[in-house]
Amino acid sequence: MGDTASVSEHHESPTVTIVPLHRSHALVAEQQLFQWLKRFKLLMEVYHGLVWQLACTLTVCLLAWLAFPDVQGQCANGIVPALSSIVPVSTLAMLRGFAEFRPHTTNFAHLTVACLLINTGITVCTGFCGERRVIGLSFALVMVFFVLCSGLTYLAGNNPTRWKVIGIGYGWSVIVFYLLLYFSPVLWVSKIYSGLYVLVVTAASAVLIYETLDLIYQRGTLSKNSVCVSVVLYTIVMSLLNMSVAIFSGHVWVQQYAEKHGGRIDGVSLLSLL
């Protein structure tokens, strides 16, 4: 009996701490609130950086265009039409390459300055080649596109059903647009440029949706870098803006090219103006 009592003294039952249910709910709610505030702060930093970069670019462009109002519209034989489509897309590819393969050794502040200088310079040149009303229309359409695409991304989120509805609706809209464009009485050159614009918008939508979903749900380490995300979104906007101006001004450049070459223009010449 004595041995049994001594054993029972040494083997005490473990203590169990019971957390009240209301306290556990409070801890979970506190953690969720902290995560939401952290994500909201990141979103504000990203879009603040985007607005700042767009404001800098547009200010420089307006000053350059107003300082030289007579330099306008004669670019059919130059390289600006091609560069206006190639350079912004190349900077976007460069950004994604650095972000994916060299995220820890890349100074994104320096990369932001480089992208600002490159995209601002090519936008100034594109503005000298395009008409002012075309630039204004392109910028308005790009802003509407950006707000609409971002809003749909926040609305759909990770819900596959919502994305399926959006995809089906957009697909049918594109089909109807191409049918109307095919049977419309406009010139074939305008049909080509209009069809290309739909493809450009579709590609830009896919890239913007992908980047916005990364930002919302922070699916990778790069999405937590506000400087990197803001410059990527800025480059998407500038790519679409420059390509919109190039496409909307394409028929004017084709006409200028034809006038300088005796009314002759072939498919290779047309592609060189894209």
Curated annotation (Swiss-Prot):
Task: State a GO cellular component annotated for this protein.
Answer: host cell membrane
Per UniProt, subcellular location reads as: Host membrane
Q: Which family does it belong to?
A: Belongs to the cytomegalovirus US12 family.
Q: Does the keyword Electron transport apply?
A: no
The primary gene name is US18
Q: Assign the protein's first listed, main location to one coarse class.
A: host cell
What does the record say about its membrane topology? Answer: Multi-pass membrane protein
This protein's name: Transmembrane protein US18
Keywords on record: Host membrane, Late protein, Membrane, Transmembrane, Transmembrane helix
| Membrane-spanning segments | 49-69, 75-95, 108-128, 134-154, 168-188, 196-216, 228-248
